[in-house]
Amino acid sequence: MFDLNNRPGGPNLIVTAKTAHKVHFFDAATLRMTATLDMPGSTHELALSADGRTAYGTVYGDGIFIKRVNPDRRVVVIDLPSRSLARVIDLGAVYAPHGVMMDESGTLWCSGELGNAVLAIDPATDAVQKIDVGGTAHWLVISHATGKVFVSVKADHVMVVDLAARRAIDRIKLPHIVEGLAISPDGATIYVCGQTAAELYVIDARKQALMKTVPIEGADGTKRQMRRVRVSPDNRYVVVSSNQDNHAAIFEADGLRQIAAFRTKASPMGFGFAADGQHAYLCCHDDAEVFEFELATGRIARTFLTAAGCEFIVGYSS
């Protein structure tokens, strides 16, 4: 069970500090910052190449979803062994790219928020194909097991795209407006977070149907807010952050029992996972601080600081 976009962590960490227009590198053992790269714009999320030697980062532009300032049209290409900016891919139009994933064929997929689309990019030629999804795409996940891409469009449904045909084929209706989404390592289960409810929705990726609704205990269901979700690479845990509540919750993936929750610093966003399988990371965007915490208990083990606006973190081995 291996997900190209959610591999076990490595001895190195890379973190986006989007407000500062920087990317940081850290030693995962010591949490010492080992390098910083200046980015050409506000770089939000990253996807790694199959060989783990390249990171692709979406340059969304400044501001936040809907309240964009100078929306961008680029994807940065970072060489991980040399920790250098190798080049920049121009998407051909101002799309405000955000969520980004790599498929098994080597195609890079990203959201094209301003184009109501997802984009399929060939990193070898920089050719870009636009696939209309009928709404402001913000995040996506790839299920190689089913040959589908699932797309969050900040509505009360998730769009489904055929990976090979590169066209939208379905929409999965949900009880509330949703935003954050994640996928199990085997590609069989999609997890989606309610934006207008403190709920986690569990979708069967093959049947394209809602299977279960899980309450997020300790989160405020009356606030409309961004929630993000990730599944641990070993498929043991599901973690959820609630951005305005400064709250994180941990669920057992088997049965989805909530086993822990903890308070965070301001504006928790993206999760990453440590190589030991016992710890995870959480970026607290507004306080520019990353938590390392125990997955089994939620206990905070260590913290470290970044430049302004940490959003995304991933471990790697190159």
What do the PLM-derived regions correspond to, one by one?
Residues 1-318:
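Predominantly soluble domains enriched in secretory-pathway, periplasmic, or organellar proteins
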